[in-house]
Amino acid sequence: MLASARQQFLSEYATVRAREGRGADEAAWYHELPYRDLSGALAHQWTIRARSWRYLERRILPDFARRHGVPLHILDLGAGNCWVSWRLATLGHAPVALDIFTDSRDGLRASRHYTAHMPFPVVEAEFDAIPLPDGFADLVVFNASFHYASNYERTLAEVRRVLRPQGAVIVMDTPVYKTSEEGRRMVEERKRRYQERFGFPSDAQQSVEFLDRKTLTELTRQFQIRWTIHRPWYGWQWHARPAVAWLRRRRPPSRFWILVGEVLG
């Protein structure tokens, strides 16, 4: 990413996140994530994150632990305030948290609330230029972050480089649509909403912002990655979203699958 675009993205991202009420002064707020948002500002969103995490913890990680042993070496890409890395560390794994956002409340510097109790490495870097050796990780986890990539092919090429043989990439809480047209409509709606609320569309990074079925098929072929789709249960209200959208003649809503991409060969 060009330095000017990166700086604009980070400045606008910090504004959005602060206005949304993310982060806190108290360590207790961080230690409760993802199960409770003690501020109440984004309680519904953290409910979704908690269900995704529980599914990963109970249904996906144990299988890889049986295959590779504990600790699993896991890259947490787009780590934000590092809550996923902390949860992974408490399970006995060896995470590395990576992000370009270093804010003290919502970025990498918020890791101090965790590393004082459970140390793990924190790295300021981009998805497409990971400063780690080939074959470093058993797993790469994108927690609500894969869609910030500006080029999925470039990002996955770097992910494949740092994965060990039989490693896997896990994509959580990234919006998935049936078609790219549905995803593009969402992006345009988000830009208009941000322009109205914050005064800018927040598109300096040119993030893709969504996945669709055709793109998943193309990434499978290009990178020899076999995707398994996991569908956590997010409750009846979430389940009813497609029907509600159809009745109101709105675009189809996104799906929040957990995608596990295992490297073949």
Language-model region placement:
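A short acidic, Gly/Pro-enriched loop at the edge of an enzyme's catalytic core
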Residues: 128-140
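A short glycine-rich, Lys/Arg-flanked "PGG" loop and its adjoining helix->strand segment in the class I
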Residues: 153-168
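A short SAM/SAH-binding and catalytic strip from SAM-dependent methyltransferases
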Residues: 139-151
